[in-house]
A protein has these predicted regions:
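Acidic, glycine/proline-rich low-complexity segments that act as flexible tails and inter-domain linkers
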Residues: 1-90, 262, 310-321
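Short beta-strand segments
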Residues: 111, 145, 153-156, 186, ...
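Glycine/serine-rich anion-binding loops at beta->alpha junctions
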Residues: 79-102, 106-118
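Alpha-helix C-terminal capping segments
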Residues: 50, 96-107, 189-194, 229-230, ...
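Well-ordered secondary-structure scaffolds
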Residues: 4, 8, 13, 20-21, ...
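Phosphate/diphosphate-binding glycine-rich loops and adjacent basic-rich segments that engage nucleotide
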Residues: 146-193
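Active-site-proximal beta-alpha loop/turn segments in soluble metabolic enzymes
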Residues: 45-48, 125, 163-172, 201-210, ...
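A glycine-rich helix N-cap at a beta->alpha junction
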Residues: 125-151, 221-227, 231
Length: 350
């Protein structure tokens, strides 16, 4: 891409004019192929961060980033669903949600990330399970989902490669908190899964990246707009993150908490979020007639062992040995690394 064309885009953003969409497409291709001067990418990111871009431009950016890599295609994506959380302390819903939804009859090709800032990543948590392989390519993801209904895989270079470079540069240019850039980064990868429905869990509070309700609402609206613009049925749930979720914080500890919920017990706040998010996806996909029916389906698979059985299938499919899977379910503390020191802190409130 010619440097003059990038400068044209930057000038249009700075003057709050609509970007030339053809040039924007060329820019995304150049980023994905790594044949653009990094200095120009930095300037473009800073312009977006300072001035913002429209919902339509954000959708075009997201679509271009999605199309920069592999896209999973399904014969019928009506029942293909996923969720994304902006992250928080003790936020481990994906570990239970994917198998529970699969047990309800929908397909969950979940791409997940590693820890960011003070929040733990789903992939880091799964890798605390001995043998669990999160490195699946798009074809492996699709094959596993067709076979057992769900997978949880790490983001990889095949999916939205343009995001890889943009994200790395955002990190060193203090543009991480740009709502259009956050939106494009998240939704481009989710859209590449070939989804029919998506639920966004936008955390708000002291332990969240978006601490004010206004910021959380703005991000939620931006992501919903971009996803719907790409034809994905999408809703956002703004949930509180002033306190940790559940009774465990830490990679292997949150696996313990998740297994407890999959066994039909565990912390009530964790289960409540899993049921809430799962029910919304069941309604969006047409699997449940309304929220009450969706919640009943989710509660049923958590109580009757079907969600736990799907979790075991997922572990086996992704490299965990049969003996270790059985140990993980029955005596997880014998398989997972234990904390070297435990301190109990009693509440002073009644």
């Amino acid at each position: 891409m010619e440097s003059s064309d990038v400068l044209t885009l930057i000038s249009q953003i700075n003057q709050q004019q609509t970007m030339d969409l053809a040039l924007l497409g060329e820019f995304i291709d150049s980023v994905a192929n790594r044949n653009i001067d990094i200095n120009y990418v930095e300037q473009w990111l800073k312009a977006v961060h300072s001035n913002g871009i429209s919902v339509d431009e954000t959708t075009i950016l997201t679509k271009g980033m999605m199309e920069s890599g592999s896209i999973i295609t399904w014969q019928d994506n009506t029942l293909v669903v996923d969720k994304h959380s902006t992250g928080g302390v003790g936020d481990k819903m994906s570990l239970m949600l994917a198998p529970a939804l699969a047990a309800c009859g929908v397909k969950v090709p979940m791409l997940a990330g590693r820890g960011l800032g003070h929040t733990g990543g789903t992939i880091d948590k799964l890798e605390s399970i001995k043998g669990f392989n999160c490195s699946l390519n798009p074809q492996q993801m699709q094959d596993q989902v067709e076979e057992i209904g769900c997978c949880i895989a790490a983001q990889n270079a095949a999916i939205a490669p343009a995001d890889g470079l943009l994200y790395a540069i955002r990190d060193v240019t203090s543009t991480i908190d740009s709502i259009p850039l956050i939106t494009a980064s998240i939704i481009s990868k989710k859209a590449a899964e070939g989804l029919g429905s998506l639920v966004l869990d936008v955390k708000c509070g002291q332990g969240a990246f978006m601490q004010s309700f206004g910021d959380a609402e703005a991000l939620a609206k931006s992501m919903v707009g971009a996803a719907q613009g790409l034809g994905i049925k999408t809703i956002a749930q703004i949930t509180q993150m002033d306190y940790p979720i559940g009774r465990y914080v830490g990679n292997s500890l949150e696996i313990l908490g998740s297994i407890a919920v999959l066994n039909g017990h565990g912390s009530s706040d964790t289960r409540e979020l899993v049921v809430l998010q799962g029910a919304a996806l069941l309604v969006l996909s047409g699997t449940a007639s309304d929220e009450f029916a969706g919640q009943a389906m989710m509660n049923n698979v958590l109580d009757n062992g079907e969600a736990l059985a799907k979790f075991k299938q997922m572990c086996l499919a992704q490299g965990v040995s049969q003996p270790d899977v059985e140990l993980l379910i029955t005596e997880p503390t014998k398989l997972l690394a234990n904390s070297k020191q435990v301190t109990s802190i009693e509440s002073t409130s009644q």
